[in-house]
Amino acid sequence: MRQRKPLVVANWKMNGSLDLVQQMSDALSVLKQPLPDILICPPVIFLSYFPKHANYKLGAQNMSEQLVGAFTGEISADMLLTAGATHVIIGHSERRALYGELDAVISQKVKVAVDAGLTP
């Protein structure tokens, strides 16, 4: 059985800036292989500002279970892909506690993410 490579996730929550994007991408670009898999999950507004490097991946902190439509403030899976995300955090305890996300919604989000090609 092949051993899984460790995954290090940096969830920025509602923090960060364009300066931090630059600092983080500069620091990550000089790291030497082999590394654990690195996943950076900044606020969605910063996703497209990260340069595309092979030594890390980008993720979003949330996404809508809806594909398109009049859902003010929501972000679709396709929008995340366009912004450069390969992953998305779904079912985080803060979303459950603060926004009342239930298993049915989380299940739908997982399905939408996988169907779109995102890794939940």
Indicate where each model-derived feature is located.
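Conserved N-terminal beta1-alpha1 strand-loop-helix module at the mouth
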Residues: 1-75, 81-82
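Short beta-strand segments at enzyme active-site cores
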Residues: 40-41, 90, 120
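Short beta->alpha connector loops at strand-helix junctions that form conserved
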Residues: 62, 91-93
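Conserved sugar-transfer catalytic core signal across GT-A, GT-B, and GT-C glycosyltransferases
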Residues: 75-76, 109
